[in-house]
C-alpha cells in the first residue's frame, strides 16, 4: 500500500488591499505521515478545548470569560503538543504591499510558490498519496492549492467537509500560522 501523507492547511489574512485589510497573508501546511501513530499524543490533550488562536487572543466566544492566565496555558499546551509531534510544516508568507493591489500577481505568486515547494520536495511525496485537509475557509486558497498540486502530477485528494474542531493537526496549523 502506498504511503499516505496528510496535509493540514490553515491560512491567515484576506485578499483585500485597502482599509482594514491585513498587511500579510500566510498559508501553513502541516504534514504527517499516517503510518506514524500519533494517537497517544492526541490522547494527552483530548480534554483540552479546541485551539483557535484568533478567538483565544481576542477573548471571543468561547473564550470570553477565560482569564489571561488560562488562555496562556492553552497556548503553552498546544506549543508542547506541537513540539512532540512527528510532523513537518511549511509556511508561505506574503507582504501584500509588494503586489501593488494586484490580486492576480499575488495569486500567481502563491500558486508558483506552492508548486515549487512540492516539486522541490518531490522525493517526499512522489510515492505517496497526499490527503489535503482544508476547511475551504477561503475558496480562492482552495483553487490556488488545487492548481499548484494539479500541475505537479502528484497523487492527491481533497478531503470533503473538513471541520477544524475534528482534527488536532488542523489546530496545529492554526497555531503555527499564529506563531509565524
What are these regions (language model features)?
Residues 1-180:
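Phosphate-ester processing/binding pockets and catalytic centers
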Amino acid at each position: 500500500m502506498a504511503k499516505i501523507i496528510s496535509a493540514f492547511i490553515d491560512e491567515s489574512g484576506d485578499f483585500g488591499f485597502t482599509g482594514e485589510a491585513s498587511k500579510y497573508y500566510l498559508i501553513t501546511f502541516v504534514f504527517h505521515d499516517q503510518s506514524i501513530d500519533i494517537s497517544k499524543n492526541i490522547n494527552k490533550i483530548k480534554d483540552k478545548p479546541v485551539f483557535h488562536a484568533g478567538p483565544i487572543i481576542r477573548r471571543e466566544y468561547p473564550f470570553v470569560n477565560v482569564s489571561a492566565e488560562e488562555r496562556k496555558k492553552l497556548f503553552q499546551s498546544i506549543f508542547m503538543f506541537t513540539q512532540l509531534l512527528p510532523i513537518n510544516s511549511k509556511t508561505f508568507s506574503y507582504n501584500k504591499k509588494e503586489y501593488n493591489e494586484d490580486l492576480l500577481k499575488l495569486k500567481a505568486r502563491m500558486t508558483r510558490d506552492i508548486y515549487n515547494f512540492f516539486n522541490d520536495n518531490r522525493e517526499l511525496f512522489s510515492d505517496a498519496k497526499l490527503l489535503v485537509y482544508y476547511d475551504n475557509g477561503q475558496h480562492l486558497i482552495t483553487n490556488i492549492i488545487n492548481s499548484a498540486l494539479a500541475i505537479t502530477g502528484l497523487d492527491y485528494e481533497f478531503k470533503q467537509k473538513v471541520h477544524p474542531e475534528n482534527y488536532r493537526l488542523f489546530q496545529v496549523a492554526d497555531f503555527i500560522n499564529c506563531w509565524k
